[in-house]
């Protein structure tokens, strides 16, 4: 399943980049994120809870930043499983920043997600709808936090 989106934030590209590559900041924007633990400079252990239909899951996974082209591109590879054995997933994501002006950045992302197991039985339509809902919540939270962070900076 491929999920992609574009949105614009009002902040300088450097601030957006620094926020984006900080997993603790990003974790606060991800609905259901319970934990982010640094393994090394590019790899993090993450626990996120979510629901798809009647199934509630807690995914434990690692995410690794495998390509970094500062301040415009980030490639992340993730792999993990539900702690309750409802399924597992792999994901590759590309995030691109494009400076529109000194105070505006377009963010585009594309994620290719492969889910297997009981959770996959709900089909792409239901999982896509849930992913869209989570994506919208993430974008709203990300935008609010980065724009608030900009206002707090002298």
Residue ranges and their predicted role:
Residues 5-7, 34, 60-67, 90-99:
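Hydrophobic/aromatic beta-strand elements that line small-molecule binding cavities or substrate pockets
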Residues 1-47, 51, 153-154:
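Hydrophobic ligand-binding cavity/cleft-lining segments
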């Amino acid at each position: 399943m491929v999920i992609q989106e574009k949105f614009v934030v009002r902040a300088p590209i450097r601030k957006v980049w620094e926020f984006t590559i900080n997993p603790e900041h990003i974790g606060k924007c991800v609905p259901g994120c319970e934990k982010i633990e640094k393994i090394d400079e590019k790899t993090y252990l993450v626990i996120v809870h979510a629901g798809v239909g009647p199934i509630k899951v807690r995914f434990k996974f690692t995410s690794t930043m495998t390509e970094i082209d500062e301040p415009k591109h980030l490639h992340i590879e993730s792999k993990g499983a539900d702690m309750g054995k409802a399924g597992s997933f792999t994901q590759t994501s590309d995030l691109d920043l494009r400076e529109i002006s000194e105070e505006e950045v377009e963010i585009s992302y594309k994620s290719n997600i492969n889910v297997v197991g009981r959770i996959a039985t709900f089909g792409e339509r239901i999982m896509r709808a849930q992913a869209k809902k989570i994506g919208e919540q993430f974008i709203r939270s990300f935008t609010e936090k980065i724009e608030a962070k900009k206002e707090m900076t002298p």
